[in-house]
Every structure is written in structure tokens, then in C-alpha cells.
């Protein structure tokens, strides 16, 4: 059962790096004979942080810049996909998702909001998401500078 929040875009998730390999498959079976499971880059990052690095969910969520609840959903989705692929003998492809590599955003850009229409910049107010702000110049919605919505690296499904 899919829990898609209709009408609400996925928030940008921070990842340390992109996967070193693009796919895993059962040995001795041609890839074109296998069903494929797509594990998104942010799901793989959640597995890395929680299962490989041993972070608690709250710490891992902070590193990915998502809520603890969102991190839990990402991790649960990844666990189900990976377990299903292992049990049913499917190949896993690591691709897609809404993410940004942590190194792609500078510290000075994290405290700025930018207009998605005219490019006007304003200081980010703590506790107020940029997307909740409107541009004082043209009235359009603002996005976090350096975030996925501001035209930086964005890999979508």
C-alpha cells in the first residue's frame, strides 16, 4: 500500500554521496530476466545512516534535514523494498528521489530565501519555512536558497 500525500511535493533530502554502484542482482541470472526494484538515493542514505552507521532516527533525520517521522517512513520504505528484493530474488536499482548532496550547498546559502519568480533574496527567518514566505518585490512564493526548489541539483523519480 502506497502512502502518497497527494498534492504535496516531497521535501528535499540531504545525502552524503550518490551510490557507488547503480544496481545489485542475484548471481547467475541475466538482468533482463529479473524484476527490478528501485531504491531511491534518499532511501539508500537512510539505510546507510541507520543500519550501517548506527545513528538513532532523530540524529539521522537531522543529517538528512527531514523530520524524524519522515525519516522513519523513508527507512521503512527502504527496508520493505530491500527485503522484498532479497526474498523474491529481484534486482535492486539505486536511482531517483528528491535529494541534494550535502556538499552542494554552502553555509552562507542556508540562511537565505530566494523568489522562485524574480530571484529576489531575503534572509531566512528561523522557524518560518521559506515556502511560507512571499516575495516583497513580486508576491510570488519563496524557496530556500541552495535547496532543491531553487534550481540546484535535483534528481527526481
Swiss-Prot record:
- Pfam families, alphabetically? DUF134
Q: Which family does it belong to?
A: Belongs to the UPF0251 family.
User: Would you tell me the protein name for this molecule?
Assistant: UPF0251 protein Cphamn1_1487
Q: What is the lineage of its organism?
A: Bacteria, Pseudomonadati, Chlorobiota, Chlorobiia, Chlorobiales
